[in-house]
Amino acid sequence: MRTHLPLNALRAFEASARHLNFTKAALELYVTQGAVSQQVRMLEERLGVILFKRLPRGLEMTDDAQILFSVLTTAFSDIERVFKQFERGEYRDVVSIAAVGTFAVGWLLPRLAEFRQLYPRIELNLRTNNNVVNLATEGLDFAIRFGEGLWPLTHNKALFSAPLTVLCSSDTAKPLQHPTDLINETLYRSYREDEWLQWFEKANMSPIKITGSIFDPSRLMIESAIYEGGVALAPAKMFSREIENGQLVQPFKIEVELGKYWLTYLKSKPMTASMEIFQQWLMNEALKEISE
C-alpha cells in the first residue's frame, strides 16, 4: 500500500526552496505567505527534520532539504513535461541529456538522425555544458562528461578516449615542420592550462609560452584557428568533418590522452525503458568509434 503523500506541502516546500523565500513561493502558488509557511512546518513535523534556516532576508536550505529538493525537482519536472505532452496530444517518452559541447556538436549530433529513425517514440532533450553538471537539480537522465570517470554519485560508463593533438588551418600548417616551430605561432588553449604542457612533454620539447586566448568550449577555439589563424590543441575525433573538408589539418601525429568521454547517470535514479534504449544505442555507437 502506497504512503499518502502530502502533495500540497511538498509543492509549498519545492517552491520555497527554489525561491528561498516564502513570500515569493506564495505568489507563485496563489496562496498566502502564512499558508506556505504552515505547509512547510507541517512537512517538517511529518519528516522529523528541519528543512530551512529562517534568516532575516530569506531562507537557507539544510542538508536534509537539499536531498528532498533534488528529488522533487526531478519529479515535478517530469510530471509537468508529461502533462504538457498529453495536453498537446503528442505524448512521447523523453530522455534528457547534457553533454560537453565539443562532444555534442562534433560527435553526437551527426548520429541522432539515425536514433530518431530507429526510435521515433523517444524524444531526446539535448543540452550542452562545459563539463560541470548536476543531474539531480537539472532534471537530467544522463550527462556525457570528459575526465577520468571519478564521479561518486553516478554510474560512469566509458565511451572512448579523445586524445588531444595540434590542429590548425592549412595555411598556418605550411611552415610547421617540427614541433619547435610552434614558437612562432599563436597557441590557443582551453581552461585547462596543463594540456599544452603535457603535449610539449610528449613531443620531447621545452614548453612554449602560451600567448593566445583561452577558450571554453573547444569549438570556439577551433573556429578561431580556422578563420583567424593560430594553433589549437583539441581532440581530432570531435572535428573530423572539418579535417575531411580541409578546414583543419593535423601537422603532427603527436597526441596526448588526458581522459575519456563517459556516459553518467545517477545511482539513485531508476532506469526507464527509454533510458535503457538510449544507453545501449550510445554504447554500440561508441564501440563502432573504437573499432574504426
Curated annotation (Swiss-Prot):
Residues 5-62 form the HTH lysR-type domain. InterPro entries: BlaA_PBP2, LysR_subst-bd, Tscrpt_reg_HTH_LysR, WH-like_DNA-bd_sf, WH_DNA-bd_sf. Changing N284S: In strain: 5E78-1. GO terms for molecular function: DNA-binding transcription factor activity; sequence-specific DNA binding. Changing D171G: In strain: 5E78-1. Residues 22-41 bind DNA. GO terms for biological process: DNA-templated transcription. Keywords: Activator, DNA-binding, Transcription, Transcription regulation. Changing P217S: In strain: 5E78-1. It holds the Pfam family LysR_substrate. The keyword Transcription regulation applies. The keyword Transcription regulation applies. Gene3D superfamilies: Periplasmic binding protein-like II, Winged helix-like DNA-binding domain superfamily/Winged helix DNA-binding domain. Changing T186N: In strain: 5E78-1. Positive regulator of the expression of the gene (blaB) for beta-lactamase. Belongs to the LysR transcriptional regulatory family. This is HTH-type transcriptional regulator BlaA. It comes from Proteus vulgaris. The lineage of its organism: Bacteria, Pseudomonadati, Pseudomonadota, Gammaproteobacteria, Enterobacterales. The gene is blaA.
